[in-house]
Amino acid sequence: MRAVSDFLKNKWVAVPAVALLILSLGFLAQNYITGSFVSGDQIEYTSNSEFFDGEVFVINYIGDRTTDKIHAEIPASELASAADGEVTKELTIDITSQETYARYSTTSTSLSRIYAFKAINSEVFTDTSSSEVESRKQSWAEQNCYDIDGDSEIEQGDDYTQRFWVDGAIADYYNAQVYCVRENGYYGNIAELSSPDKEFEAEVEVKADGETPQSTTLSNSDLGQGRCDNIGEYVRACWTGLNPTGEGVPEPYNVYAIHSNTFSPEWRVISAERYSSYNSYVENNLYSQIEAWKEGSLSQEEVVSTANDQAAQAAQRVSSGSFTDYQVEDSSYENGQIRLNPSYDIAWPEFTFYVDGADYISVEKPVGEPRIVNVEGDEFGEKQSGTVTAEVENTASYEGSFSARVSKCSDSFGYDSLQETKTVGPGETVSFDFRVSFTSDSFDQKTVSGSCEIVVSDTGDSSNSDTAVVDVEATQSNECTPNEEFVRTINSTHSRILECSSDGLTTTEVDVCGDGEEAAFRDSSWTCVSDGTLPGGGDGSGGSGGGGDTDDCVVFAVGDLEIEDPFCADGPLEMLSKMFHLVAGTAVAFFTGSLGYRAGRWVDGEYQIKGGFDPLKSRSVSRAKRGRFLIGLIAELVSFLLGFYVILLVPIWAQLMVILGYVLFKYYTPF
């Protein structure tokens, strides 16, 4: 009692528990055993039960199979050891009796009934003719005699016999004396027995100290294998199967069943051997005894007595063999049921008992007491992640297993819902860190404030928990390129021209294109134009330089590099600009080609040779004078392309000013 008192002073928390007792019970009917204990290694403590809430005891028990009665005591110390807690009540399981038996069903057959007989005779005569007396004799026999050979025909020599004579002083009289037996009632219809079903009954009582015993009668004939039934309010039992004992179940090979309303009960198990003897007597001996009666060697009473003795023997209840101790459980002709109780156990039943520990077994288990003593939030940007932290202290005097998680966050803030579990000693503090994120569809730059909820509980008792709210802040990211215009489509039908603010976070609507209009890039800005003004039906999304305005002018593109058709232009002014580009490209090509020619001769040590770059010069000219033709040709081609497409970047007004300046410098002479 002192240990229990100290335990309660330490504020252990009562935990709802369920005792799950798995008992394999199989016994032979001899003695009554007391004190059959369960060893500690057969007890587990888990939190899985399909019938009751809370933790459960898993207590495995296997009977010693030496009795039909058992008294199993499960000490409180064994339960406490498995639960790692305190249990003050012992649990006892009493099987006050149990028996196993075989059940047989009756099956109708075409076997003949068992009849009682009466010996009869009659004299038939006529003065007409012998054929007439023969006809009258046969008619009488068919109406009164039993079909002994069972061929559905009443025949002389098989089913009846006769004496025939003729007499008369004045006229002839034809006489016939007929001898046979007829039915004088029957004992019943014959049926076969089906193969047996193994069944059991057990009187079970489960009791915890100081509680009302829970008891019932269990039988698989009511439950069915794997099914469960209640034993009172707090106990549930499941039958899980039958283990064979090694003893065979009697098969109904040597017996039949006979049904008659004159029997009590109406079904009776009879000997198959006696039934066969009765049939053999009728088929092989009854006719010869009728002949003996006709000849006078047997009396009429002796024939009847012998035949009816055979029938009575066949209809008697079986008196030897395995089926002497049976019970009729259903007397109806259609659903006859025979129960056989052998003198030995034919199987051992196995049970699983579920005992509600919350109300029936007191279990006290030490758990921790979590308290959140501090929380820390975080500030982070959009599409980034931050960390929230909770510091948790165990304020109990016992070790706790604390599980923490983020249960919810404000809108637009995401979180990882997985929980983290840590073991915390008495008075210790641990930290839990959780990742949070932020995502928004808004264009407005702003700081968004929110919060997340953190929940911590002890895994041994979820009611021991604490909750705290932590603040979080997130900053909206840029949504566009500062000071640039761009186009968005409204409902896939209309273009909307927007201008990005200087901070890249907000936009201003510039224009919305109407029906039949598209957004096109013109003179370094976006504008709405009619569909027909776009070459090739394009959307006018070209760049802002002096090149073409549509993608129709692009003949080659790799990444951001695009090469346009030099003769593709939007208007005469752009065509004039491209003509200047051709002139500039050609000039640059000849200049760089000459430079490449000179460089090639310099490399060959021919820098003192005079002459110009003329790739079409006669082949008789020395190789040294020709220089490196291939190098010069490649340099010329590259220079032309560079000259043409570099000049494309120069606006046309700048090109005109350069040309005008060159002309003035070349041809103008001041006074």
Swiss-Prot record:
Transmembrane stretches in the record are 13-33, 575-595, 629-649, 651-671
User: Which loops or segments lie on the Cytoplasmic side of the membrane, by the record?
Assistant: 1-12, 596-628
Spell out the disulfide connections.
145-180, 409-452, 480-500, 513-528
Name where it mostly resides.
other
Ranges for the region named Fusion loop are 168-173
* Taxonomic superkingdom: Archaea
Question: Might you report a single GO cellular component term?
Answer: cell surface
What Gene Ontology biological process does one annotation of this record name?
A: plasma membrane fusion
Which Gene Ontology molecular function entries are recorded, alphabetically?
A: metal ion binding
Supply the alphabetized keyword list: Calcium, Cell membrane, Disulfide bond, Membrane, Metal-binding, Transmembrane, Transmembrane helix
Subcellular location(s): the record lists: Cell surface; Cell membrane
Give residue spans on the Extracellular membrane side: 34-574, 650
Q: What does this protein do?
A: Exhibits fusogenic activity. Mediates cell-cell fusion in mammalian cells (bilateral fusion).
Q: Domains: what does the record tell us?
A: The extracellular N-terminus has 4 domains; the first 3 are structurally similar to fusogens from plants, C.elegans and viruses, while the fourth domain is unique to archaea. Domains I and II are discontinuous. The fusion loop in domain II is stabilized by a Ca(2+) ion so that it protrudes from the molecule.
Q: Which family does it belong to?
A: Belongs to the HAP2/GCS1 family. Fusexin 1 subfamily.
- Record's subunit section: Homotrimer stabilized by interdomain contacts and numerous Ca(2+) and Na(+) ions.
Q: What's the protein called, per UniProt? A: Fusexin 1
Q: What organism is this sequence from?
A: Natrinema altunense (strain JCM 12890 / CGMCC 1.3731 / AJ2)
Q: What lineage does UniProt assign to this protein's organism?
A: Archaea, Methanobacteriati, Methanobacteriota, Stenosarchaea group, Halobacteria
